[in-house]
């Protein structure tokens, strides 16, 4: 399955909530869902029909996939891995998604969106423990150091992000020094620290059918 290349604002409208896929734009009055709080393809707001149980489970899975930019087969593999591990499956699933390298780069404030973070990783701008890593799905672990390559720090967009990061609150499970483009994974995130609008138990129910 190919990665979605269309207008990402349509995805937020489809899910009926902000997925923060557009970086800075999501925090302004230009955000599409603030102007058109109804699904794409409709000519104005209408009452949403009541979804079936399966429909709600499917929508929740799609929402999580879109937030993290993960393809269907990848997402299914994450679920299988979470299901094998000890602990609550849904929370473990979110933890696996949160510890993807592209997400960590985004959470540290080195990119304005997960899509931009994924691009930075793919283009070789990110290093983990002193080695360049260009795989967005790379799983980081507590103690890992994540930095922007020294040669990449003078890129105009990287400098712009440095200014945008002023006042940005880094999650407590991470550390980030925006002045020096360095960060560290302190520990794994707790569920209450993962601020995504996802009801993970519905995803577990979907894959358990």
From Swiss-Prot:
* GO annotation, cellular component aspect: small ribosomal subunit
Entry's family note: Belongs to the universal ribosomal protein uS4 family.
Query: What is this protein called in UniProt?
Result: Small ribosomal subunit protein uS4
Task: Report the record's Gene Ontology biological process terms.
Answer: ribosomal small subunit biogenesis; translation
Q: Among its keywords, does the record have Electron transport?
A: no
Where the record annotates domain S4 RNA-binding, the positions are 99-164
Its taxonomic path starts at: Bacteria, Bacillati, Bacillota, Clostridia, Natranaerobiales
Locate the coiled-coil region(s) and give their ranges. Answer: none
Domain of life, per the record? Bacteria
Q: Which PROSITE patterns match?
A: RIBOSOMAL_S4, S4
Q: Which UniProt keywords apply?
A: Ribonucleoprotein, Ribosomal protein, RNA-binding, rRNA-binding
Q: Name one GO molecular function term.
A: rRNA binding
User: What organism, scientifically named, is this protein from?
Assistant: Natranaerobius thermophilus (strain ATCC BAA-1301 / DSM 18059 / JW/NM-WN-LF)
UniProt cross-references to PANTHER family, sorted A to Z: 30S 40S RIBOSOMAL PROTEIN (PTHR11831), SMALL RIBOSOMAL SUBUNIT PROTEIN US4M (PTHR11831:SF4)
In this UniProt entry, which cysteines form S-S bonds? Answer: none
| NCBIfam families xref list | PRK05327.1, rpsD_bact
Summary of subunit composition and partner proteins: Part of the 30S ribosomal subunit. Contacts protein S5. The interaction surface between S4 and S5 is involved in control of translational fidelity.
Q: What is this protein for, i.e. what is its function?
A: One of the primary rRNA binding proteins, it binds directly to 16S rRNA where it nucleates assembly of the body of the 30S subunit.
Q: Show the InterPro entries listed in the entry.
A: Ribosomal_uS4, Ribosomal_uS4_bac-type, Ribosomal_uS4_CS, Ribosomal_uS4_N, S4_RNA-bd, S4_RNA-bd_sf
């Amino acid at each position: 399955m190919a990665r979605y290349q269309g207008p990402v604002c349509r995805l937020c409208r489809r899910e009926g909530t902000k997925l923060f896929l557009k970086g800075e734009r999501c925090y302004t009055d230009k955000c599409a869902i603030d102007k058109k709080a109804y699904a794409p393809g409709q000519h104005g707001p209408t009452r949403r029909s009541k979804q079936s149980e399966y429909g709600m489970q499917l929508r929740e899975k799609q929402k999580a996939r879109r937030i993290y930019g993960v393809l269907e087969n990848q997402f299914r593999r994450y679920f299988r891995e979470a299901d094998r591990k000890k602990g609550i499956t849904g929370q473990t699933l979110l933890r696996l998604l949160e510890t993807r390298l592209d997400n960590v780069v985004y959470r540290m404030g080195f990119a304005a969106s997960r899509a931009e973070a994924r691009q930075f990783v793919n283009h070789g701008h990110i290093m983990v423990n002193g080695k360049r890593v260009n795989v967005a799905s790379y799983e980081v672990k507590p103690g890992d150091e994540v930095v922007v390559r020294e040669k990449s720090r003078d890129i105009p967009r990287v400098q712009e992000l440095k200014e945008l990061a002023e006042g940005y609150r880094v999650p407590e499970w991470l550390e980030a020094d925006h002045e020096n483009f360095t960060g560290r994974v302190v520990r794994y995130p707790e569920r209450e620290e993962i601020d995504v609008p996802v009801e993970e138990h519905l995803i577990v129910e979907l894959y358990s059918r």
